[in-house]
Amino acid sequence: MNPQWWMFIPIAFLAGSVPFGFLIGRLNGIDIRTVGSGNIGATNLGRALGKRFFYACFFLDMTKGLMPTLIAGHFMGTLGTMRVEAPDAFWWLGVMLATVLGHIFTPWLGFKGGKGVATGMGAMIGVMPAMTLPAAGGLVVFLVVLSLWRYVSLASSAAAASLPMWTWLVFSQYHTLMTRQASTRTDWEHLPAEQIELIKGEIPNYGMPFFVVSLMLAILVIYKHRGNLGRIMVGTEPQIGDRGSAPEAISPMPPTADTE
């Protein structure tokens, strides 16, 4: 483990803490915390100001998650490989979590931020390729659930719940692929070290840190959506496209404890 990892954690937290939804709202004359559900995330901003503001906020939130993990992985030499030793993997994933926690507990708004969906997606994409592929799988789940039920919160929760499964699947397929490639080779002196380890049965479980952290992230995101899921059950949660018809989308109300 490289001790320089520690310096990326506070940088990632500060990057994640930039409240783009709040800032965009201020620039357009509203305090997003007093509009609709009180969420500072892209969904509530889109309901209040329109689709283009949703896309702008989502892109910015995703980018602030992407850049810290991408830069940290580049400088620490973990970017672009599945074979990351556990200590370095946990530090890299710590950078990923720091961006999400910065978004959820932004110090600039009294430690009350969003739910971390867009920021988490960007941060996962930056952990290439180990978490990029699970993020893609989660995106597929998000789009399918959204198209069927039209609840952003339900789609986000379903995508988060699928992340540990996708992470396990990606690493199990990686292990199988490397084993098959190694079993067909006889020129061991030209084999990569990880393939020799596979043949000897000595390869570490590289996927375990990623699985553990993906499970933690899934639990965190679902917990942050507990209020939305409760409103879905009683039929009061707005669906996508309800900007004009959903009362919470057009009338100011006090901010709720549940933020996006």
Residue ranges and their predicted role:
Residues 22-54, 113, 230-260:
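Cytosolic, membrane-interface loops and tails of multi-pass inner-membrane proteins
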Residues 47-73:
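Multi-pass membrane catalytic core of lipid/isoprenoid biosynthesis enzymes
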Residues 13-15, 22, 56, 100-111, ...:
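Transmembrane alpha-helix interface/packing and boundary motifs in multi-pass membrane proteins
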